[in-house]
Amino acid sequence: MKKEAYFSTAEELARGGLETIPPQMISGKHLIYSSPATLAFNSPGAEGFGVKRAGLAVPDSIMLIVAPGCCGRNTSLISSMPEYNDRFFYLMMDETDIVTGRHLKKIPKAVKEICDCCEKKPSVVMICITCVDALLGTDMERVCRKAEEKVDIPVRPCYMYALTREGRKPPMVHVRQSLYSLLEPQKKKGNVVNLLGFFSPLVDDCEMYELLQQAGVKTIHEISRCKDYEEYQTMSQANFNLVLHPEARFAAEDFHDRLKIPFIELRRLYQTDKIENQYRALGQVLGVSFDQEVYKKAAEEAVERFREVCPDASFAVGECMNGDPFELALALVRYGFQVPEIYGTITAENFVYIRHLAELSPNTKVFSNMEPTMLYYDPSGSGVNLTIGKDAGYYHRDQPNAVWNQDRQPYGYAGVRRLFETLTEKVLQKGEKV
């Protein structure tokens, strides 16, 4: 094996097309390298919103993790957080459980025991199971129904199946469906909207809130801003849903099928002209014309302030951050900056950005974090002087890094403005150290 990290250029990828992506870029075609750069990204309990933390987005919910010790232990970090220290419970599986499946009979009893010991009755119990039960073929829906009979509150499955990560319904897609499956039909209100997609709120200064108010919306629901289970239930009063992340698409379709709430899908973008077009299209659907000039101007001014302090910016863009690495890289190139390297997972949805990158920056190198040859990655000679994403920061430890992986979600013009303000701050901090 050659001792250098495998990559393809944007031009090579675009020329071959989506059907001929090199096997090195498809994690299901080779051994997975758990790069230290992506440990938080790979571990469902380590950082950000993995399956376990996401499963507790419903107010007053608790979670029972049914797993061998090796699968459950990475939850200990989340359990130490004040808002979660009394919401995680464990049912440990031993070898006999795995061979015989006897743990399935223990689950309803465990759920009842947990609910009896809680000071406040939980709103819902999420049962998180792992690849072990995927391989056993466990019918978790049936197990949850048995548990519901014992406690008389909703019990829902939560699948932490790494095996399904590249399937039709990956774990983070399924957990979103589970979260919203608890909503009961209610009378619709014309001035209520749900924002679906994230497990934490948009940044408070996101223009989305004010633009929706321009359209006559009075109430904007986000699951993470619901104070209690009763407020969470009012999400079923929405006139329509805005889907802000593609992993919430299945959940939105469930909304439409069960609760007759239609949805409009938007993308998180870092190109200001594309953001403008997206809001304009949304306004046309809603029958309004959004006044978005002040927000766009603030974002573009932040880009120009950054350009003044770092006109020769040369970026490495990773995937462990709040954004699509290929769309963000394209935005940076269109703003006039260099992007020599991207670390990302190629999908049908983001391949369109690779095609555009191939036209503007054909020599940009694309690496896969999970490809084993990343063990030999060498940053020397890359020309990178600034990084975005935790993984990119790992590969280029001597360069300023914007981790850009905060819980509060950057979106729209506010996301662009905040990103470039952060980058400006990082560059100035490096100058002070020098």
Features from the language model and the residues they span:
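An N-terminal assembly and electron-transfer interface module characteristic of large anaerobic redox
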Residues: 1-434
